[in-house]
Amino acid sequence: MSNILIKNVDCLTLTEPVKIIKNTNVGISDNLISFVGKIPAGFKHDEIIDGKNKLLMPGLINAHTHLAMSLFRNYAEDVDFWTWLNDKILPAEEKLNRENVYWGSILSIAEMIKSGTTSFADMYFFTEETAKAVEETGIRAMISRSVVSGENSDKKLKESLDIFDKYNNTADERITVCSAPHAIYSCDEIFLKEVIAESKKRNMQIHIHLSETEEEVNNCKTKHLMYPAEYLQNLGMFDLKTMVAHGVYLTDKEMDILKKYDVSVIHNPGSNLKLGNGIAPVVKMLKKGLNVALGTDGAASNNNLNMFEEIYLATVLQKGIMKNSIAIKGIDAIKMATVNGARAMSLNNIGTVEKGNIADLILIDTDKPHFYPKFDLISDLVYSAQAGDTDTVIVNGKILMKHGNLLTIDIERVYFEIEKQAEKLLK
């Protein structure tokens, strides 16, 4: 790895108290941030990045997605959630193969890098191909083999555990692996207990969908005589570090349970809106002290992987439904997309720009019409910034994109392969 000097840059460190340091310098030695501020005497660099009209900040963290679902972007549109899932997506996923998932993963990683995401949490299939894509492209990821009960469930669970044994803390520790029972409606109680028991043997983190729809909640109440989070607590899932995606219909009691067990909630505002599933009570979650992170969900239900869009939605939606413009602040949403995501995914020393932390960083080009006048760059990031403003992306001290040019992905090859894969898959 090389030493990088970023000169004369405005820097949002996200350390407390949160502020922007104007016209500063940041050094990277190997994969770590070596200084913020004055350039130390004797610091030797292999590369200089001019930070003029740029804002340096921690890379964005997409804490819930389904990477290769980019293959189904714009495929199942304007239908209700259960039609979308049962009649369109699940039958299409039955046709997936390793090659499909590899190229779908590469496409999604390219989209994420281009829009400032440096880490993501994925649950999907053919996870070896996702791992291969992560290793090749240089991004950081928590991956998992999603499992459901039913036919071949034991085989799928074994695959999930094998993925952990083979890939956890690999690729210079950029890849971690968690356990991913899909949801309470797709995993019966016996299977969930088995997943939890096997995950405990390896101390695996859990990533699961929870309380995404009203129907899911009502069915759980009817079948188990309790709400979804109560049900999972009763099964012992929260004895393991857990993050739950969506949480749209969490009750006060459920939030208290999640807080007690330090369970993170991954808010997916764009996907929840598009599928008509509602708006999560994020303000209440934050007031109760829950760790709330952000995700895009898959590109089949969003239909992009743009975390700047999720930051914007996470802010304005809560202001709107609360009828209170100060119910949530822009900086809260930025933290959801950075430090809170790092906490949810157990990413230590990531999410802030400070000496000794891992260098997962992005540079935003603020020399754009929608950034002027520059009264408040934090507000600019929340309410004005676009995915295309991402100029440079660094993960683990390695530059993955410089001045908008992807350095680890042949994007024209990706476009060619994706059209070929989609045609074979959905013809």
What are these regions (language model features)?
Residues 234-241, 283-368, 384-386:
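His/Asp/Glu-enriched, well-ordered alpha-helical/loop segment
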Residues 9, 26, 31, 53, ...:
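Divalent metal-coordination and catalytic microenvironments
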